[in-house]
Amino acid sequence: MAAAAGGPCVRSSRELWTILLGRSALRELNQIEAELNKYWQRLLEGLSYYKPPSPSSAERVKANKDVASPLKELGLRVSKFLGLDEEQSVQLLQCYLQEDYRGTRDSLKTVLQDERQSQALTLKIADYYYEERTCILRCVLHLLTYFQDERHPYRAEYADCVDKLEKELVLKYRQQFEELYRTEAPTWETHGNLMTERQVSRWLVQCLREQSMLLEIIFLYYAYFEMAPSDLLVLTKMFKEQGFGSRQTSRHLVGGTMDPFVDRIGYFSALILVEGMDIESLHKYALDDRRELHQFAQDGLICQDMDRAMLTLGDIPHHAPVLLAWALLRHTLSPEETSSVVRKIGGTAIQLNVFQYLTRLLRSLASGGNDCTTSTACMCVYGLLSFALTSLELHTLGNQQDVIDTACEVLADPSLPELFWGTEPTSGLGIILDSVCGMFPHLLSPLLQLLRALVSGKSTAKKVYSFLDKMSFYNELHKHKPHDVLSHEDGTLWRRQTPKLLYPLGGQTNLRIPQGTVGQVMLDDRAYLVRWEYSYSSWTLFTCEIEMLLHVVSTADVIQHCQRVKPIIDLVHKVISTDLSIADCLLPITSRIYMLLQRLTTVISPPVNVIASCVNCLTVLAARNPAKVWTDLRHTGFLPFVAHPVSNMTQMISAEGMNAGGYGSLLMNSEQPQGEYGVTIAFLRLVTTLVKGQLGSTQSQGLVPCVMFVLKEMLPSYHKWRYNSHGVRELIGCLILELIHAILNLCQETELHSSHTPSLPSLCICSLAYTEAGQTVISIMGIGVDTIDMVMAAQPRSDGPEGQGQGQLLIKTVKLAFSVTNNVIRLKPPSNVVSPLEQALTQHGAHGNNLIAVLAKYIYHRHDPALPRLAIQLLKRLATVAPMSVYACLGSDAAAIRDAFLTRLQSKIEDMRIKVMILEFLTVAVETQPGLIELFLNLEVKDGSNGSKEFSLGVWSCLHVVLELIDSQQQDRYWCPPLLHRAAIAFLHALWQDRRDSAMLVLRTKPKFWENLTSPLFGTLSPPSETSEPSVLETCALIMKIICLEIYYVVKGSLDQSLKDTLKKFSSEKRFAYWSGYVKSLAVYMADTEGSSCTSLLEYQMLVSAWRILLIIAASHADVMHLTDMAVRRQLFLDVLDGTKALLLVAASVNCLRLGSMMCTLLLILLRQWKRELGAVEKILGPLTEILEGVLQADQQLMEKTKAKVFSAFITVLQMKELRVGDIPQYSQLVLNVCETLQEEVIALFDQTRHSLASDSAAEDKDSMETDDCPRPRHKDQRDGVCVLGLHLAKELCEVDEDGDSWLQVTRRLPILPTLLTTLEVSLRMKQNLHFTEAALHLLLTLARTQQGATAVAGAGITQSICLPLLSVYQLSSNGTGQTPSTSRKSLDAPSWPGVYRLSMSLMERLLKTLRYNFLTEALDFVGVHQERTLQCLNAVKTVQSLACLEEADHTVGFILQLSHFRKEWHFHLPQLMRDVQVNLGYLCQACTSLLHSRKMLQHYLQNKNGDGLPSAVTPRAQRPSTTTTTTTTTTALATPAGCSSKQPTADTEASEQRALHTVQYGLLKILSRTLAALRHFTPDVCQILLDQSLDLAEYNFLFALSFTTPTFDSEVAPSFGTLLATVNVALNMLGELDKKKESLTQAVGLSTQAEGTRTLKSLLMFTMENCFYLLISQAVRYLRDPAVHPRDKQRMKQELSSELSTLLSSLSRYFRRGAPSSPAAGVLPSPQGKATSLSKASPESQEPLIQLVQAFVRHVQR
């Protein structure tokens, strides 16, 4: 880019100036030294560094091939116009283009070709040239200012440079001064057509400014180095010739605007001559009586020449101090010789009003500019004044007040009052003090004016206080002799005969001159001035004076008394503002100020200046004790106030009921008409101080009317008021913005929207956003860079970096406007309506004159680096929040502004903070400003060889700079400190995050890009306790995130080789372990400091967050990241665990808890990812238990999510390995903790459910248009919520506790079960809290395993909680949480209301199984309540084979199986239901057999019918098997809600269909086996029916019809013997298929190995067959023994049975010979009675009894 700017150029003088000020990137001592060593010659040459044109130089320019010819031409024209050397002109042009040119390089070509544009450019270069010249002088001034200042960091470097300059500096600068005032003004003949009158005037201003600066340098030089007498003579003659600035060669051109410069030349001329006379050392020699040692005492000839020269002076004021000084010098050194000359010279000086002149001089110098020059001038004048007062009689020096004024100006230098109090009171300024004391308190003002000037530091303030506290004389004036005094003979002494009360109206505080007091009398203008010898404290006297004013306030004397009181108040203000501790002693005065304010504001024409002084005093007091000042002030009615408290913002903004107070009426009636605003300035400072002192406290609400007054009455209109003095308008604007800035800066975002009554910040935000106050702020921001530059250029003194001129005030105001606007936008509550402020900020104006363009152009400002920085910050804010295109707003200037941004960004000496802000702005723009970021990326596109587009970086691409900033290979990277490096990395991160592919593409191709980018990750950081630069952590965090984004988005194989190498290096150099250890040490450090001393919390959070993402990516892309070592993984996990533990144990620190919560997430993820590799579970459980305890002690609202994470981690750990109670540390305490948490959570859920129920019913009555503004609390029933996870954790812990003792103790200590069941009941009734309900049932199910647990659950009232409420689950309309039909196991396990019903059924089954008769009544109640659903479910299997339906049938049959053990009791209580269940079980058996028999039909069913929910619920079968009916009612009965898609799955392959089929088959088989087991309890026991003749057959119904045909699937045939035989056949066939391994049905079982699956299936099939045979035999004998059955039917049955069973037996025998499994009957079910127990042995031979039994039965039948 430098090349683009027209070649490299030397360091400009302005850059050198910036470096010396310490505002550049070069801030190290050695860098400053190097710069001074390099450029000291230029400083020595001064203005003569710039040479006049010469032919040889022109030739060299023409011959130079490195410079483009158009630039040469322009350079030569510039050379002629400025009268500057051609080579230097070209160099100047190049520097200008680099630093100040406001166009693009492309536009430069057109500018050079266009005559008018190139003329305008030449004029701008002239301005630049003038500033360059000035900057050389500024540099020298700066060196002279600080080279002896011990406090300055570069003092030694400056001193070395001044040593080099010392010898020749003054000589050269004096010559330059002479040249300047003798130079002829340029004309158009000599300098070309461009030299118009205006340009000549501009030149002359520059000439005068340079003269004044040269003289200032010479003056400062002579303050440090002695002037030879000969030099004084030369200078005197030179200044005389030049008329002390007034006799310029071009004086005919000097206009009124140039007078300040001419005056300055005169002032410095006079000061240089006075300084040259060395009056200070003369004073010392005179005191020591060694006058001959003074240099002028030794050089009589020069003294005579000087005398002659001095006698010719005296016609202009500038001569006065020179004449006075010379008269003193001659009078001291040779009083006899020169008495007449001295008298004449001295008289002339007095006639010229020397002291008035000196006062003017000092005020002019103090009004802005270099403090050092001002204080040096003060020292110079102090010496002169002290010596004059010591040497001459005071009355000979003219008007005493003038001397006092000069003394006060002199004492403005802080060091001089200290000096004064250290000197003899009889010499120097002590003489004036003594003189004014002689008139005190008759004349108050002179003494107080002088003492006010004598207060500069705390020690001097105490001296002034003591001085006034111990007065020994009281002076008063009498026109006539009082009658109560005795006079001495000669009348010079009076003695009081009676005591005198000095203030008759003074009240309690008073002064009394006692009887007998003596007073000296002086007659003065026919009046007696009496000096009473009376000791008193002036402070008491002042109190009396104020008291007097309060008494006369409504009389005509008020003005006179105000003149006496104002100096008192001013002195008090100065004393307490210097040393606030004295305020306590001055309480009698300060406490009366409030009353004074109250009284004075009501006077007809109020004394505005006194009121302003009073307010200033209160401002100082408010800094110390705002609450007291505010309370006392409120009673005075001075400040604006409201009659009634304001409750809302609308009232506030409208200023409803507001009273402007005493101040408001003063402003309207006195200040605005007069154009003087002392009270307004004081008022604004007071309110700002009060705001800073008590914002956030309750009293800040009382300040609302004051702030409202400022926002409504002052800010919108202050610029339209009438003003007498220049600069007051700007000051008021600045103070108003300072007030708003203080309010917005001190407020917390949390406070902003929390309070109900509007606060000060929200008032400011609302006013600025929605009223005309905001428009004023916008107009301030819109002043623009050109206006500011103009004001700065017009200042007589723009040299001081800390100057207080108009320009600096304007810059400060604009900066405040930026900051205020930025804060208003940041803090404004979100709204759908665009506020007028935002509208004005973002609207597009014609010709780029909108505010965005104005803001962007502040980049051209050079005086104060904070101004462009704040402008860019505001742009950044607007680019983030406002819906507009910055690029469009910039219009045609966009590219030029881009160039300016990049020029400053790439400059090696630019202030680092501006660079950071530019990069932050671009970082935001990546996401929000696509057009703008394309402009800055400046990517050039060309077509690649293979037809794809190739991108490359344009010349003006910001990526050049960014790549340079991250280049770790470069040496001496002073220009890239950590903050800037971080900003560059953040910009790259934004590109990656926003997926700017073209930019990423280019960056990836850059050599060593990944190496440079990641180099910080390979460094070693200092420990957290010593980290001085936290931005390094943020840098590393962003780099980690970039790597993660790259790995995540780029296909594994396509990663750059360079990145792969870097990742490999990261792993091989053990950086995982390093960073893991560092993050852990951060956590430990945070925990140790309890998060309190941590200033870099944000960076810590960023690093932890990035490390978390990196580890997550590394865990999922282990091969890419080379994180495959199990030991490393284990170590990383343990580090995370330790770090989390350290943080979460600091329950008192919110910061620690937040960071701990972040690490807890990582802990959980790693635990799940690496659970097989983490080794001993016990090592993890210990820290986890501690973490849980820490979390439970912390703020529960804050820890809600963290608690859930810890619970989740516990669940994961407990599932990793089967544990016993002894394996878990503090198991019982852990259980108690979990249950206590659960107790609270469940109660909260209960309350929330009830509340939502109440609010839902209330909401129905509300108008539908009403919206609820308050955010709803997070619902407790979350799948990952604490409550649900707590229940799951409790379940896991319960499973560990085999005998249930620990749980029994907990249930005794805590009412957890009743609470749980109550909430469960409400949830079921309302069909709400699905996740909770499911988790609670799982826990209860686990508890019910053990006898104790089951007893506890039953005892807590489980039936009442579940039985009736469960009806709601399938009777209420589904609220969208229904289950979609699916054949996948995963979706079946997802929480659903049908799942809740199934779980309830399982719970009942388990409780009945565990408690048996103790739970029977409840079980019968349950089956009675849910009988319809039970029967529907049994019937539905035939129609719907969805997993949900099969699962429910399985659970239902399981419950019936348990209940069937209690046949008699069931029959007694619910005979009809029992019969219906028996019938339906038979039909279910038939349906299962049919579906298992015909696989193709089942597959067809699955494909076509199961997409729908149950279209028709099959009604339960009637009692008699023969009459069966079906109705097609449309109630949604079972598992799936209607309306789900019935399309065939498109993407499912055959394999997945097969899997689904096998899952359904397995489900049907389970249902079938349980159905048969249950039916077995409803049929007579085989042994009993065969052997017991007395068996009551009526107890047992027929379960199967006497039919042997295999039933077809569609026909509604009653279940028969054919059904049972078919079932045996199906089971046998399936066994055969299993042996042949034809089908992979074993996978559906869900066991880990195929062998286990096969074993399970075989057992199940054998169990089914055994039960079939058992039922067959039992039912056959039941038929045979029943007399009601016709013998013919019995005979037919015997025949059919024997033939069918014989066939089956032969098949069975064949199967057993091959080897068959054992029956699981003994394990799964209560053993069948009698012989059947012998059927379930393990060895194949033992299977023969089954065959024997069947054979025996066949023989029995055949008889």
Curated annotation (Swiss-Prot):
Tell me where in or outside the cell this protein is found.
Answer: Nucleus, Nuclear pore complex
Q: Where is the composition biased (Polar residues)?
A: 1539-1549, 1730-1742
Report biased composition (Basic and acidic residues) as residue ranges: 1259-1277
* Modified positions (N-acetylalanine) in chain numbering: A2
Highest taxon in the source lineage: Eukaryota
An example Gene Ontology molecular-function term: structural constituent of nuclear pore
Q: Which UniProt keywords apply?
A: Acetylation, mRNA transport, Nuclear pore complex, Nucleus, Phosphoprotein, Protein transport, Translocation, Transport
Q: In the record, which positions carry Phosphoserine?
A: S1719, S1727
In residue numbers, the region (Disordered) covers: 1255-1277, 1508-1552, 1718-1743
Pfam families recorded for this chain? Nup188_N, Nup188_N-subdom_III, Nup188_SH3-like
One GO cellular component term noted in the UniProt record for this chain? nuclear envelope
Q: Where is the composition biased (Low complexity)?
A: 1523-1532
Protein's GO biological process: mRNA transport; nucleocytoplasmic transport; protein import into nucleus
Q: What does this protein do?
A: Component of the nuclear pore complex (NPC), a complex required for the trafficking across the nuclear envelope. Required for proper protein transport into the nucleus.
For this chain, the family text in UniProt reads:
Belongs to the Nup188 family.
**Official protein name in the record:** Nucleoporin NUP188
Q: What is the lineage of its organism?
A: Eukaryota, Metazoa, Chordata, Craniata, Vertebrata
